[in-house]
Amino acid sequence: MSEVDLYNLAPMFQLMAVGLAVAALPLAWWLWKQRSATPSQRLRALTLITLFVTFDLVLFGAFTRLTDSGLGCPDWPGCYGSATPIGAKVEITAAQTAMPTGPVTHSKAWIEMVHRYLATGVGVLILSLALMTWWLRRQQIRAGQTPDPLLHPVWPWFTLAWVCLQGAFGALTVTMKLFPAIVTLHLMFGVGLLAVLMAQAVRYEGAAARAVPAGLRRGLWLAFVLLWVQIGLGGWVSTNYAVLACPDFPTCHGQWLPAMNWQGFDVWRELGMTPDGQLLPFEALVSI
């Protein structure tokens, strides 16, 4: 597939319709269940629904990664210019015939596209959350009321900007052919989106902030940083296919300090390559 073909916006409106369909059921359920709730309760419920669907999306993204389906449809946002693998049956069959165990097969194409459908649905839910916050706040202002601080639009619109950036990384993951740094950032932004939505849901509870001892606060921040480092390292292992570089545990090839090559931590390089275009040595995978 040529560089020109990597982005094909022809199926964009069809994919947007699919995203609306994915979001329609949870939105309908939310409207019915929260029809008599207060504004903050309605927003909290919608945030929790969005959080649940986003968590499912992250899990399915991991499944997409584990099944090596990230390039099941090698263009973006559709699949060979179609909204579903059905419309790309001829192209997928040709690719699968040429490489039966390659990156493009019918099953991998469906896995990748379902991941994109879920991502589009999450985008619709987050857009709905931002628009609902704006509308409820506007209604209070029109009624001459002091706007509820919980209805401040900064959080929802920040979340919307975040998910748009996450979508951009999702596109680059495909068009840059699983470039390790991009795939790792895509993972971390996905986990970060979960954290942002959780913080937003807690905020809508309206609970008063509690004082935290300085020592505990420092410990929590340290744990937070270590958690993100570990998530990043785990993503780097996965994106570089380095998980089996050490087949034993807790040693590596029977050694506590095996031979290592730190080129594995050169960030800006293609998959399996060094920054100067050479094949990445096995010792680099061991170091990762």
Regions of interest found by a model, annotated:
Residues 26-37, 130-140, 199-208:
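Structural signal for the C-terminal ends of transmembrane alpha-helices
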Residues 46-68, 226-237:
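N-terminal signal-anchor transmembrane alpha helix
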Residues 10-18, 110-128, 180-195, 284-288:
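Membrane-interface loop-to-helix entry segments
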Residues 2, 66-113, 243-286:
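Extracytosolic (periplasmic/ER-lumenal) interhelical loops and adjacent juxtamembrane/interface segments
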